Swiss-Prot record:
One of its GO terms (biological process) is lipid metabolic process. The chain crosses the membrane at residues 601-621. This is Receptor-type tyrosine-protein phosphatase N2. Residues 394-404, 691-705 have a biased composition (Low complexity). GO terms for cellular component: receptor complex; secretory granule; secretory granule membrane; synaptic vesicle membrane. It is a single-pass type I membrane protein. Self-associates. Interacts (via cytoplasmic domain) with PTPRN (via cytoplasmic domain). Interacts (precursor form) with CPE. Interacts with HAP1 isoform A. Interacts with AP2A1 or AP2A2 and AP1G1; indicative for an association with adaptor protein complex 2 (AP-2) and adaptor protein complex 1 (AP-1). Interacts with AP2M1; indicative for an association with adaptor protein complex 2 (AP-2). Interacts with MYO5A. One of its GO terms (molecular function) is protein tyrosine phosphatase activity. Pfam families: Receptor_IA-2 (PF11548), Y_phosphatase (PF00102). The modification Phosphothreonine is found at T697. It comes from Mus musculus (Mouse).
Amino acid sequence: MGPPLPLLLLLLLPPPLPRALPAPASARGRQLPGRLGCLFEDGLCGSLETCVNDGVFGRCQKVPVMDTYRYEVPPGALLHLKVTLQKLSRTGFTWQDDYTQRVIAQELANLPKAYLWHGEASGPARSLQQNADNEKWFSLEREVALAKTLRRYLPYLELLSQTPTANAHSRIDHETRPAKGEDSSPENILTYVAHTSALTYPPATRAKYPDNLLRPFSRLQPDELSPKVDGDIDKQKLIAALGAYTAQRLPGENDPEPRYLVHGSARAPRPFSATALSQRWPPPPGDAKDSPSMDDDTLLQSLLKDLQQNSEVDRLGPLKEEKADSVAGAIQSDPAEGSQESHGRGAEGQPREQTDAPETMLQDHRLSEVDDPVYKEVNRLSFQLGDLLKDYGSPLLPEGPLLEKSSREEIKKSEQPEEVLSSEEETAGVEHVRSRTYSKDLFERKPNSEPQPRRLEDQFQNRAPELWEDEESLKLAAQGPPSGGLQLEVQPSEEQQGYILTGNNPLSPEKGKQLMDQVAHILRVPSSFFADIKVLGPAVTFKVSANIQNMTTADVIKAAADNKDQLEKATGLTILQSGIRPKGKLKLLPHQEEQEDSTKFILLTFLSIACILGVLLASSLAYCLRHNSHYKLKDKLSGLGADPSADATEAYQELCRQRMAIRPQDRSEGPHTSRINSVSSQFSDGPMPSPSARSSTSSWSEEPVQSNMDISTGHMILAYMEDHLKNKNRLEKEWEALCAYQAEPNSSLVAQREENAPKNRSLAVLTYDHSRILLKSQNSHGSSDYINASPIMDHDPRNPAYIATQGPLPATVADFWQMVWESGCAVIVMLTPLSENGVRQCHHYWPDEGSNLYHVYEVNLVSEHIWCQDFLVRSFYLKNLQTNETRTVTQFHFLSWYDQGVPSSTRSLLDFRRKVNKCYRGRSCPIIVHCSDGAGRSGTYVLIDMVLNKMAKGAKEIDIAATLEHLRDQRPGMVQTKEQFEFALTAVAEEVNAILKALPQ
């Protein structure tokens, strides 16, 4: 038959996680009938109920008990009950909770029952009306169980030989039974372990325990308790159980030796772990194995002498002598030695001082029990067994972090008067522990020396934090009169989980399991020691299951940190960090948070760099395309010169097809109704807001105006360009011919007059007598009609298209504005800066701000727009003070064209020309063009504009050289250098290319 069901269930039950302090009994509501668990916790049954042993947990039933039965639990159901109890315990439920009662009742409802003829029951908690005969029976049975237990377990602890003594048998005295009111000390070690499990609390008064709780001791085989089979972990559990059992023994007033370490009330105290015991009794100096005072012979002699020197041994009855022999035989390792020492003298023992009196309800029974010598000797030997466990338990304990304690509970002493606590006070959450501590050193004391008492209060100053360290493992449950006791305020703690952070992200579950297995190997614990193992990114998290070593998560973390190199070598992982965090804060570990932040930063950095590179690449591409457009035209023109029969013919045919497919209608221009227009009308085809004064804006490339150029004009332009590109010397020949050309007539007598000579800027450029602008002398401030300005006719000899004039001199500014007013001019084209290299090219003939008066003409600056670095636009109001008329005049000032030179690019000048023509569109007045002398730069601009205007109007033929001769017939010196003439040809070619691109496809 296997171990009893309560033992297996409760040994495997982990300690509960305290959710909160226990509520008073009144707060739990009315007690339900038939509650379960009364064998392990008192106070469950009502005043009219008794606890019936059902073979599992115990059930409360009303008196008289009519229906008694036991559950027959198969192995599968046993495992299921274990899992259920573990879940309830970890959640924090106790037997007092209705939820626990419902869950356990539901689990037991499916189990088979075996009905009994007589029920085994015990009264409610702390009831003094127990059956005295039943209590005496189990008192003797307890002594027999203790003898058998010592005989079995002392060899297992390697303290004595495994050979049992021949006379280690005891009989049961059915006639001698203790009185009722006996204390609740457990009969044997396994019963004690079962009753001090996490979910249960032992009852204040003993119930009649079932026989099967004692049967395992007589049925266990020697090999079942062999250290080779069970290993170090079973030794540690047994050591803790034995130590706690010896601490549970309660003395009477006249006991020769105190037999308990923690004097509790009816509730049994929390069992000390092996670690706590090793800390409670300090080990003697030197190695335990080498010390001569710790050999087995000396221990046995001391134990046997104490037993035989009892003064009342000779007066024992026959049955009690057998009981004493049974105890002596249970602790002897050698039969011969035991018989030799059984008649030696005993040591004198004096009772230690007692600070608290026994409970009133137990006084009668204890006084009667003191008279029993066997009871005295058994309890005294139990105390000596505690000292043996102190010295021999330490070598069996695991090394390393097991002795390290991370969490502490504050311990407070209570000086309240002694009184019996009510049920509400028992469940109040502050546990009162009345305790007296005694320690006897068997190995260092001298014979006939009086043992020195050691108070529990003194020991708790240094040892209490270690003894009560783990609040999650076992909870102290003893309550009694508070006089001289201790108050332990058990504070609920948030569930903690340990984590080990590695350099692998993500960490595979297999690697995480391997890492925890290696940690378990270092701690010498099984893999099941760790629960809830999870992998979160690069970290593995875990919880420490309930264990007899009282090992906490902090101990495991310290062990992992101390053995970091060993773990890395065994698993191949890089351990970055280990620690403890609340369960809810494990989602983002420090390394994960840092890694996520760095990842975001790196990602944003790369995106920014990519955007910057994209913008730079697009800008470079656009620049290259625009820069190469000029060279594409030159390449095309060069290709036309190299092979005129191919590209030229194809371009001409394409132009013909386009013009035949789409022939735009001639646009009719509305009549010019007024010479006075607003500034806004000059810069756009439609109304637009007038620009603010002296503002600047960027320029835009004006698209060429839609041309009326037909197929014949296209043929003429292509043929002319083809001829110039094919014949390299044609340009030079044409320029030589132009230089030799003499205009007829070319008389300049008026300009050469003495009164007019100061009005000429250059003697090389004088107006022809037949082609000059005549001012109204009556309006002139000098009563003169002369000004160095020439009208340039195009196709209508009556209306000049341009007026080419020199830059005004300080003496001719009034004449210049008079010419502007009398000619009705609205557009002025200025092609020179005011000065070049310190040489004055033109006088500043307009106001910088406000207005200036020149004779009878008031000029008011309205606005000044800087369109680009090459030119700007100014707008003026011109008022005739004699007539009070006002007109608007716009000046286009080109800044980057110097004397005897050409602009840096044709593109800027062509854009400038388009801007001028856009403002001039729809007007019939001439355009005033001037530079410094009014011939070189002014002639080049007029030549380009005149040729392009003819092409746009659909001229049937075009000859640039002939056009220049036509200009020189009207003003001398037009286009002064060969470079200016070549620049005019290039500008015309580029504008033709732009017109061809603008034609509808």
